[in-house]
Amino acid sequence: SSIEASGAIEIDLTQQPNQSVTVNTLREYLPNVKTEVVDGKLKIYSTDNLIKPVIKVQIGIDSLSTIEARGASDIDFKNSFALKDLNIILRGTSKADIKLSSAQKLEFDIQGAGKIHASGVADTLNIRGDGASKIDTEKLGSKVVRIELNGASHAEVFASESFDGHAFGVSKIS
């Protein structure tokens, strides 16, 4: 399953057998917050971009393949997820705190000033960062890491078997 958040949405994700979605914001603003499932993707957004109260969404989900956050969304894994493949796409100033007990393949695609912190285990980690992105995966045990950074991005990674990295502009990989 997939999740797409647009705007300034705070999302707390919990891996659990039962699926659930709870939205919290100011009562008078709640009708402007939309959650809909389109082609297997849960979309979360606001129909009113002028008013900016905090919008918090708690999601319980058993499996996850893609998270896309645009604008200034904040994604937080509340427990460690066990997944096969996970693709994280961040645009704008969105942030993600990823916790994995196991994953075969983890992919990050960040454009803008997004930030990702990831911990746990992912056999293969692929990263693409453009702009002023910050990626911290030092606490993510990965066998294979492939990374390409452009602009003024910064990444901290760990690879136990294979590393292929390219940094362009004033980007830095450590």
Model-derived features: where do they sit?
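Extended, compositionally simple hydrophobic/Ser/Thr-rich segments
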Residues: 2-13, 57-59, 63-174
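Short acidic/polar N-terminal linker immediately downstream of export determinants
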Residues: 1-31, 40-60, 75-77
